[in-house]
């Protein structure tokens, strides 16, 4: 019985692998060619547009086309109590779009001039959080009476920028001597001092742990802690 050399088996395996790679490259090229086929060569199965569905157009003597005005559902309706059309400010939340609270950055004069917005953000308890109205707009295609832009709601002046209490507490406990917790919260100046003193020889590290637990150390941008759901 003839013996098959190991080198012969390896050589056959290499040829088989090379042939497989070439086959895959050919299949990939065919697939990419089909995917980049121009739209004019493809068979379209879309529904033909009926003549009655095409918008009416006016043609001038010079050949230019002037489109006619179409019906618009965003026009303002006059409020009539017996009619089913409600005021825009009474629409449910799924039919309106509300902007984020306006940030005045501590400018009280701008708040008094505009009449709404947030002078400051943040707060750990309800009584410490400012509330404001926000500018809302009725969505396109929704019929309602009165102005389509209006002030609504009593939104809290809070924002979230990706800071988690548990994560920051772990940073403070394990890496607090290097100021990692304050770096994460945006307190760069004090973080550098904490790093150079190795957490104030342990005293600063312990104080920051207490401040985090009691709510005395918060993000520098006045944002609130993100919650896990």
Swiss-Prot record:
It is a multi-pass membrane protein. Residues 181-194 are cytoplasmic. One of its GO terms (cellular component) is membrane. It comes from Danio rerio (Zebrafish). Residues 1-32 form the signal peptide. Belongs to the TM2 family. The chain crosses the membrane at residues 160-180, 195-215. Glycans are attached at residues 34, 58, 72, 107, 130. Keywords: Glycoprotein, Membrane, Signal, Transmembrane, Transmembrane helix. It holds the Pfam family TM2. InterPro entries: TM2, TM2D1-3-like. Residues 162-210 form the TM2 domain. It is found in: Membrane. Coiled coil: none annotated. This is TM2 domain-containing protein 2. Residues 33-159, 216-229 are extracellular.
């Amino acid at each position: 019985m003839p013996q098959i050399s190991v080198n012969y088996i390896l050589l056959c395996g290499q040829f088989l692998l090379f042939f497989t790679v070439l086959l895959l490259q050919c299949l990939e090229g065919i697939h990419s060619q089909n995917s980049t086929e121009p739209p004019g060569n493809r068979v379209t199965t879309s529904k033909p547009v009926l003549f009655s569905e095409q918008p009416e157009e006016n043609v001038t003597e010079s050949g230019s086309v002037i489109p006619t005005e179409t019906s618009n559902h965003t026009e303002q309706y006059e409020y009539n109590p017996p009619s089913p059309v409600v005021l825009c400010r009474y629409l449910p939340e799924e039919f309106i779009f509300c902007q984020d609270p306006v940030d005045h950055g501590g400018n009280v004069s701008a708040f008094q001039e505009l009449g709404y917005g947030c002078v400051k953000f943040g707060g750990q308890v309800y009584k410490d959080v400012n509330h404001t109205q926000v500018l809302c707009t009725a969505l396109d295609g929704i019929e309602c009476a009165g102005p389509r832009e209006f002030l609504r709601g009593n939104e809290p002046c809070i924002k979230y920028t990706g800071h988690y209490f548990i994560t920051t507490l772990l940073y403070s406990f394990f890496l607090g001597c290097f100021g990692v917790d304050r770096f994460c919260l945006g307190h760069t100046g004090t973080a550098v001092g904490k790093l150079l003193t190795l957490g104030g020889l342990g005293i600063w590290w312990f104080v920051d742990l207490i401040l985090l637990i009691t709510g005395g150390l918060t993000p520098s941008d006045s944002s609130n802690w993100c919650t896990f759901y």
